Swiss-Prot record:
Protein name: Lipid-A-disaccharide synthase
Similarity comment: Belongs to the LpxB family.
Top-rank lineage group of the source organism: Bacteria
Pathway of action: Bacterial outer membrane biogenesis; LPS lipid A biosynthesis
Enzyme Commission number(s): 2.4.1.182
Length: 384
């Protein structure tokens, strides 16, 4: 029988964006149930909320098919260990946050043993591999969706799902304040500033950081007073960035690596170069023009290209239903093209103003009390 005062809630996340969602979820659950206990796999932000992580979350932060194949034995070992540990601990509910290829397998095994399961952040079934919907309905009791077009797919398949809004839209202010952001970071108000967001995973840094830094050098030729800001999500990414920056060709690049503070960095920027993923939505909610880029192994790219069912990869473009911002991917992700696209935003404020109106409408659409809605659903599944 569930102890309604101190339920044991298992949570598993695979990367930095999931760690942030997990931290907010823990905080929201504690408001409703102060004695709740949390265990599973989490990152630094979740640990700061009192979460007990049984395995290193960084070991799951891999990108793309080819990268997963190389690390598959270790990932499967961690998953088997987590299932074994949770079957022993018998949590009142399991919440898998994103990382569906890892978490849904855990959820399915726990659900068969009678443990209620929730998947928080629907996989992009509306974009590719839509056949997964029926399987997901079988694997979990409930899906918590961040985007409004997602729940109906699960409802049509006989599952339970709801739109809880996107946490960033709820947490981030609707209005823009570049001046305050620049003051916070100690950046001159009158100079060109570009933010570089190469990704939160070490594997993304390996692919994207050299290209982004080469792009910055080209922008510096065009705007000699420019400065570049880069928020590092974790200590692991910070260490890898430092290694890349030690290369001779990047000596003298006026780039500041900042601990986290990605929102402040984006608000301080005139334009943002960002790797496709959750970060693109954060940039949009900051009302900043961006150029979206992505490079992955040829094997992964060939697989994804065959499967994808939508014309865009960037979340802002998908949600707005048009290419509102440029996407330069794979062979198109060349420093010369990226620099030209960023310069186009910097030199055309009228285009930026129109884009900001689109981003404001998107912000209003996604704005809900996400963490509280998710907490309510999780506690309901736990019987609290």
């Amino acid at each position: 029988m569930v102890d309604k005062k101190s339920p044991l809630i298992a949570v598993s996340v695979g990367e930095a964006s999931g760690d942030l969602l997990g931290a907010h979820l823990i905080r929201a659950i504690r408001k409703r149930c102060p004695q709740a206990r949390f265990v599973g796999i989490g990152g630094e932000l979740m640990k700061a909320e009192g979460f007990e992580s049984l395995y290193d979350q960084e070991r799951l932060a891999v990108r793309g098919f080819a990268e997963v194949v190389r690390r598959l034995p270790e990932i499967l070992r961690i998953r088997r260990g987590l299932v074994r540990d949770l079957l022993s601990l018998k949590p009142d509910v399991f919440v898998g946050i994103d990382a569906p290829d890892f978490n849904l397998g855990v959820a399915e095994r726990l659900k068969r043993s009678g443990i209620p399961t929730v998947h928080y952040v629907s996989p992009s079934v509306w974009a590719w591999r839509r056949e997964r919907v029926g399987k997901i309905v079988h694997q979990v009791n409930r899906v918590l969706c961040l985007f409004p077009m997602e729940p109906q797919l699960y409802l049509d398949a006989g599952g339970r799902a709801e739109f809880v809004g996107h946490p960033m839209a709820q947490l981030m202010p609707l209005e823009d304040d570049r001046e305050t952001a620049r003051k916070t970071l100690g950046v001159d108000a009158g100079i060109p500033v570009f933010a570089l967001l190469p990704g939160s995973r070490v594997s993304e840094i390996d692919y994207m950081a050299p290209v982004f830094f080469q792009t910055a050098l080209l922008l510096l030729e065009r705007y000699p007073a420019a400065r570049f800001l880069l928020p590092a999500a974790t200590e692991a990414t910070k260490r890898r960035l430092a290694e890349v920056l030690q290369r001779p060709e990047f000596a003298g690049l006026p780039l500041t690596v900042i601990d986290r503070q990605s929102e402040t960095v984006c608000r301080a920027a005139d334009a943002v170069l960002v790797t496709s993923g959750t970060a693109t939505l954060e940039v949009a909610l900051c009302k900043r023009p961006m150029v979206i880029s992505y490079k992955i192994s040829p094997l992964t790219y060939a697989y994804v290209k065959r499967k994808i069912k939508v014309p865009h990869v960037g979340l802002p473009n998908i949600l707005l239903g048009k290419e509102a911002v440029p996407e330069l991917l794979q062979s198109e992700a060349k420093p010369e093209k990226l620099a030209a696209a960023l310069a186009d935003w910097y030199e055309h404020p009228d285009k930026v103003a129109a884009l900001q109106q689109d981003f404001r409408a998107l912000h209003l659409l996604l704005k809900k009390d996400t963490a509280d809605l998710a907490a309510r659903a999780v506690l309901e599944e736990a019987g609290c």
